[in-house]
Amino acid sequence: MIDLRYSSGNIFSESVHEIGIIALGSFLENHGSALPIDTDAKIASYIALNVSIITGAKFLGIVLPSTEYSYVKHGIHDSIEDVINYIKYLVENGRKIGIKKFLIINCHGGNTIIEDELLKLNSKDCFITMNSVCLTHASTEEVSLGYAVGILSEDKMKDHDPKVYGEIGMVGLTEAREKNEAIDLEAKSVEENGVFLDKVNGKSLLNDLINNYVEIVKNMI
């Protein structure tokens, strides 16, 4: 039996090895002209990996499936069951390497509908929590955050217009706006204020998100 040196390296404490971080986003979803279709997955992975590096918690990778409200039609998504089953796979294998607590960093609003099913995976010796970052779709905050992460094409911002790409702010997603008041309010805000790149705010938002998740990990130790 190998004696592992759990105290080695830049970590908060040896107990942090019992915490696993999972990224959750969406891989196949339109985000206008300036952001890639896997924006949510890349932002979630970027934050999760950086939190892992800072704290010493284990980065377990990203969930491949994602889900969405049935009336939001801007991408290709999976069932709640598909997402939960993939999380189960990561949790089961994470427990084999000594992980007892799991933090899911979710950066896709549609995935919040898994929360009730996710709670059922908790047990007395396995704790799972999901904390979500939900920004107005492909709009100012997400564009600026995408810039900070390094996935935004500034050249394509000139064409990043909700009148052309209806998924921006969900301005053109009529059914979603009719069925979800929060979506409609966000869409109206985008219609009134437009979409622009704020580089300073993007970097600040990214740092704040990373620091927030670092604190969550600290509280899980």
From Swiss-Prot:
Keywords in alphabetical order: Hydrolase, Iron, Metal-binding, Zinc
Cofactor binding note of this UniProt entry: Requires one Fe(2+) ion for activity. Requires an additional second metal ion that could be Fe(2+) or Zn(2+).
Residues bound to Fe cation 2: H31, D40
Single Gene Ontology BP annotation: F420-0 metabolic process
GO molecular function annotation: 2-amino-5-formylamino-6-(5-phosphoribosylamino)pyrimidin-4(3H)-one formate-lyase activity; ferrous iron binding
Reactions this protein catalyses: 2-amino-5-formylamino-6-(5-phospho-D-ribosylamino)pyrimidin-4(3H)-one + H2O = 2,5-diamino-6-(1-D-ribosylamino)pyrimidin-4(3H)-one 5'-phosphate + formate + H(+)
Known pathway: Cofactor biosynthesis; coenzyme F420 biosynthesis; Cofactor biosynthesis; riboflavin biosynthesis
Pfam family of the protein (one): Creatininase
Record EC number: 3.5.1.102
InterPro entries linked: Creatininase-like_sf (IPR024087), Creatininase/forma_Hydrolase (IPR003785), FAPy_deformylase (IPR024901)
EC main group: hydrolase
Matches recorded under SUPFAM superfamilies: Creatininase (SSF102215)
UniProt cross-references to Gene3D superfamilies, sorted A to Z: Creatininase (3.40.50.10310)
Residues binding Fe cation 1: E29, D40, H108
Record's subunit section: Homodimer.
Family statement drawn from the similarity comment of this UniProt entry: Belongs to the creatininase superfamily. FAPy deformylase family.
Name of protein: 2-amino-5-formylamino-6-ribosylaminopyrimidin-4(3H)-one 5'-monophosphate deformylase
Gene (UniProt): arfB
